[in-house]
Amino acid sequence: MKQYEYLFNIHSLYNLARYAFLKIESNYARTVETSSITLPQLRVLWIIKAFPGISLSSIARIGCWSSPTVSNIIKILMNKKLIFKEETINRKVYKFQLTEMGKWFININRQDNNKKFYLFDLIGLFSHEELDFIINIFTEIIIKEKKEFIFEYIEKINEMNVKIDLTNFDTNKVSIIKKTINIYNLLRTFILTVKSNHREPLKVFNVTYAQLRALWIIAAFPGITSSELSGISFWSPSTVHVIVKNLNSKHFIHKEKALIKNAHYLDISPEGELLIIEDYNRNQKTLLIFEELKDISSQDIVNLNCLLMRMNNRLGNYKTEEYINKTFAIIKNRAFGD
């Protein structure tokens, strides 16, 4: 297998996993927000339920967040009286517990057949053998990322049924749902770990991870509007506005006023294209941010990609394959030269 074919499969794996995760996550977030809580806030409640008396640093580790991010979420949850903290001998360290109201919020956000929950759309998409294959590959990846602690969390939330009310499902479907939840959590850990690993190497280019993702989308779809960028990226319009403003100020993109009111057509500049190719050569072509994928066989990666593509299609991520092909066409043309 030629190097660019192998790297295409790595590129595909990452983006197929990323877009499947983002589609499920965005749907989950919208569903949860109807109860006046955000998904990250609910996730902290799950973690505390699984590990009563847990510390802030351990919540950050399990949730794949920074400590300042968790600190802000904790403040909000305490103000809502959904959690409380126990003082310890070391007054600088606190242990967090759920209040009765916190437990209630977990219960009302358990998903069932009456809610449009995308994880349910995946029931019947894969056989048990295919589900096990996906789980085994991502388990191997997570172990190499040294995130084994996530397995205990996944096991506990499956035992507690904090995410889904399984009352009206038969035994076979319960097994499939639990495996699907497992995959969702493994995808999340993998994607957020790669994002974290990529953040530091990007500092030399003076861009954030989100700005890099936006540049790739703009490169793949020349003339894209901000609203279209929002849809493909799963970012809010306000987030896209900030990202576009920053990229434009750094001369990495061009903006041209569109016929639609308050809209602009976006194109990547030569400086922006040079940046994404330099980042690819330095951090992705070398597998610097994909170290955990090195020992997975090429055939397993191909097989996994087929399953992840099926997942994206079921979730309605029809642009994913086009995005992968267009971005890798740019990579092949600029980074390989054959």
Please give the residue ranges for each predicted region:
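C-terminal regulatory/oligomerization modules of transcriptional regulators
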Residues: 1-5, 128-181, 299-338
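Residues within the DNA-recognition helix of helix-turn-helix
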Residues: 73-76, 239, 243-246, 307
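A structural signal for well-ordered alpha-helices, especially hydrophobic packing surfaces
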Residues: 21, 106, 142-146, 191, ...
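N-terminal helix-turn-helix DNA-binding core of bacterial DNA-binding proteins
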Residues: 26-69, 197-236
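Charged, amphipathic alpha-helical coiled-coil/dimerization segments
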Residues: 78-132, 246-302
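Residues within the helices of the helix-turn-helix
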Residues: 57, 75, 94, 227, ...
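N-terminal leader segment of winged-helix/HTH proteins
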Residues: 1-35, 152-205
